[in-house]
């Protein structure tokens, strides 16, 4: 089967947005797509070139891409981006690139990228260098999702030499990026120094690595399939929490895998093996009456009533106090929304608007002073005939985790607690 025929056999959709750098790989991808329109007239193609501004020749590259796209009659978008270099130039450029693509992609378009067989080898070895498990060693797949977009990599079966030979046969030229010779970057070091030696020794090295990556991917999928019943039993999607009632009965390997599935579902960075062990020891299996927490980057993993919660880092808002005035809005601290006092015919209503939720508390009309604050320690009575009890017991009755209790607006009338908005009123 020819390169073109094998490429066309993979096309299952009609609309593609092609990531086009102007290099040999993406030029081959663009040319194969353009050629495929001859017997697939339904194909609708667009290309996008990201102008990073990192190379002195960046403007020339954009002009080259425009010329190639005009020749192949493919509409081109050229998008200039600014790179956040805090996470490194490579990662910053990658994030800026995909953000721009996401901005321009139509809802029904598949993003096509030009990763080929040798790219797969490099990705596998970089994952190996990081100590990745089978998920990382699965490297790249023909179809996946990335940054919330469907990604299509139809060149993975083909080698770079095969793609360049195709371009020569089509009389198409391409850009040579001089930064590819900079061996300070890990991928370039592998490409320029290590892999040529391995390929001289083992001519089918790239194909063998590709097979290993596929085996890892399939094993990872199988593990997920086998774990899914236990995961779905314990995972609550509404608040992204994970139940621990059955956890102690699982093997250590299953415990690790389920927690990794949970963190993946929550879209947070995966902890190292030692961190995961610490999470299980210090949080999952902490004393029943403890309120443990584990810091994971910008998130905090907490446990309450035998469930794991994932929260951001919260600021201390217990010193906040503001007076409420009718028809005036109070902005609450730490992005906790706003509170508005409304005067009705028979009463006053404190309306708390937070994210997509709205809660209220009612009070009788009067000349009293009404204020809002956070955090309260003491006893409360919810009904006239009730005994006073510690507010901690009331929060427990409503299953409110300790870290949320100081983030719920409390309404005070003449200095006395009258309501935890949206939860309970105090007699």
UniProtKB/Swiss-Prot annotation:
Localization of this protein: Cytoplasm
UniProt xrefs under InterPro entries: Lysidine-tRNA-synth_C, Rossmann-like_a/b/a_fold, TilS/TtcA_N, tRNA_Ile_lys_synt, tRNA_Ile_lys_synt_N, tRNA_Ile_lys_synt_subst-bd
Signal peptide: none
Pfam families hit by this protein: ATP_bind_3 (PF01171), TilS (PF09179), TilS_C (PF11734)
HAMAP family tied to this protein: tRNA_Ile_lys_synt (MF_01161)
Alphabetized NCBIfam families for the sequence: lysidine_TilS_C, lysidine_TilS_N
Protein name: tRNA(Ile)-lysidine synthase
Gene name for this UniProt entry: tilS
């Amino acid at each position: 089967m020819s390169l073109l025929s094998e490429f066309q056999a993979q096309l299952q959709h009609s609309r593609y947005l092609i990531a086009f750098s102007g290099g040999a790989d993406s030029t081959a991808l663009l040319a194969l797509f353009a050629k495929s329109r001859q017997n697939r007239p339904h194909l609708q193609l667009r290309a996008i070139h990201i102008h990073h501004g990192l190379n002195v020749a960046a403007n020339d590259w954009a002009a080259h891409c425009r010329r190639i796209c005009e020749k192949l009659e493919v509409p081109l978008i050229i998008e200039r981006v600014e790179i956040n270099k805090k996470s490194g130039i490579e990662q910053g450029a990658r994030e800026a690139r995909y953000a721009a693509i996401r901005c321009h992609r139509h809802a029904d378009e598949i993003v096509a990228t030009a990763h080929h067989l040798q790219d797969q080898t490099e990705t596998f070895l970089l994952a190996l260098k990081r100590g990745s498990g089978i998920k990382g060693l699965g490297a790249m797949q023909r179809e996946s999702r990335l940054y919330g977009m469907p990604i299509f990599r139809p060149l993975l079966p083909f080698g770079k030499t095969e793609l360049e030979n195709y371009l020569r046969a089509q009389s198409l030229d391409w850009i040579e990026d001089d930064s590819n010779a900079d061996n300070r970057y890990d991928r370039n070091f592998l490409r320029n120094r290590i892999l040529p030696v391995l390929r001289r020794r083992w001519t089918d090295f790239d194909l063998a690595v590709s097979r290993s990556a596929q085996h890892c991917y399939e094993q990872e999928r199988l593990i997920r399939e086998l774990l899914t019943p236990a995961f779905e039993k314990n995972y609550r999607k509404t608040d992204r929490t994970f139940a621990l009632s059955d956890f102690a009965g699982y093997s250590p390997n299953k415990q690790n895998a389920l927690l990794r599935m949970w963190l993946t579902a929550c879209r947070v960075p995966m902890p190292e093996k030692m961190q995961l062990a610490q999470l299980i020891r210090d949080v999952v299996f902490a004393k029943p009456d403890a309120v443990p927490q584990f810091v994971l980057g910008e998130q905090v993993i907490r446990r309450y009533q035998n469930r794991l919660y994932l929260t951001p880092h919260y600021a201390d808002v217990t010193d906040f106090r503001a007076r409420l005035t009718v028809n005036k809005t109070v902005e609450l601290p730490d992005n906790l929304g706003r509170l508005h006092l409304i005067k009705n015919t028979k009463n006053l209503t404190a309306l708390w608007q937070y994210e997509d939720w709205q809660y209220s508390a009612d009070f009788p009309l009067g000349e009293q002073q009404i204020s809002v604050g956070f955090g309260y320690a003491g006893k409360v009575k919810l009904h006239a005939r009730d005994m006073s009890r510690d507010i901690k017991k009331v929060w427990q009755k409503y299953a409110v985790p300790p870290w949320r209790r100081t983030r719920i607006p409390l309404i005070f009338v003449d200095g006395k607690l009258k309501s935890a908005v949206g939860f309970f009123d105090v007699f």
